Amino acid sequence: MFTVAIIGRTNVGKSTLFNRLIQKPMAIVSDTPNTTRDRIFGIGEWLKRKIAFIDTGGLIAKQTPLQQLIALQVQAALSQAKAIIFLVSLQEQLNSDDFYVAKVLKKNKDKPVILVVNKAENFNPKTAEETLKDYYSLGFGRPVVISAAHGIGIGDLMDLLVKQNQLLPNENNDDLAKIRFCVIGKPNVGKSSLINQLVKQNRVLVSNESGTTRDAIDVPLKVNGEKFLLIDTAGIKRKGKINMGIETASYIKTKLAIARSNVILLMVDGSKPISEQDEVIGGLAQAALIPVIILVNKWDLVLKNNNTTNAYKKMLKLHFKHLDFAPVLFISVLKNQRLNTIFEQLKIIQSQLETKVATPLLNDVIQQAQLYNQPPLFKGKRLQITYAVQTKSQIPHFVLFCNDPKYLHFSYARFLENKIRENFGFNSVPISLYFKSKNARIRTKPEV
């Protein structure tokens, strides 16, 4: 996917622009410098073309321990980007940090840099040459003038990015397959060996040394006539230890791979206890809000009895509490055991993602659920759901209209979720329920 890194000094509006480009409030926006320390990824769309954006921390010339880490993360983002937005501010004069950023970007000679002047709400096109003359000194030509906060000039910027994308070799891998899945997990759980088994050839470096796979590699697959796209990533080390360039790059590549996927394979080592590191990686899978398959590898090394499998599943639920929808497959990559079940499960998930529930049937289930189990009282008032509908989304998404969302208890939301799962076969995918007042236009979160 065409990937663009947003680079600039502190407090020029990078996160505001990022949120505008992906049309979602993912990044924290603050007037405080260095608010964005970890990299944030999102996908925007313009003229039916998808573009991945990387939000980055502010680069400054002064080298502190924090700034050195941010610089490493920015370099990793630059290594993944195919184009760069260099963001500066019209509300402040250019300073030494802007020129420092320009110097860093000039080292990436093989990638186009678009100079963007932000915070230009009061920009007057009639005096453009006089206003912008200082920005030419950065060495990146005529700037694009925008206001990220007000949406001014964003269309022109997106047009430029689409043109840059068209100049690059065409990459169709994302569009070849309905199912795009990535494999994530801590280093040395067998991810690379799994991919080698699935594609029947050595596409990635395999070693007993922890963390030997560095790049995200797209592997188009065709199984029984079905097209899949497998996105391999490096194993994720503990986030606190991601302080060297190569591991920072691996972490970024993993999150980019997740952003491009519609299914995640979360791989754990069945011969070892679930670790805190596994739980952190499980949190990444949960946060993606897409289907997850848990692969328990090295199952051939486990001594078993009649209860071993069920006991392990219960243990997984304790460690991955919010992934209870995720199917669990017990495999051995080394012995090539039960690997075919991965593609079988992927097809089941795809079928569930494509399931559309007829509105009358959905409302019958919701009304019957309310008759069977009334919502609990909230300050003497009871929730009443009058209408429900499934809306288009990446995962099954249901909007439930009610008298007042504040009467909803989280346990009743979970009860309704389970009823929808039971009646319509959504047993292997996450689903989302939004509760709205009958007269409201915005989402209201349930009170817990």
UniProtKB/Swiss-Prot annotation:
CDD domains: EngA1, EngA2. Pfam families: KH_dom-like (PF14714), MMR_HSR1 (PF01926). Residues 355-439 form the KH-like domain. GTP 1 binds at residues 8-15, 55-59, 118-121. GO terms for molecular function: GTP binding; ribosome binding. Residues 2-169, 179-354 form the EngA-type G domain. One of its GO terms (biological process) is ribosome biogenesis. GTP 2 binds at residues 185-192, 232-236, 297-300. NCBIfam families: GTPase_EngA, small_GTP. GTPase that plays an essential role in the late steps of ribosome biogenesis. Belongs to the TRAFAC class TrmE-Era-EngA-EngB-Septin-like GTPase superfamily. EngA (Der) GTPase family. This is GTPase Der. It comes from Mycoplasma genitalium (strain ATCC 33530 / DSM 19775 / NCTC 10195 / G37). The gene is der.
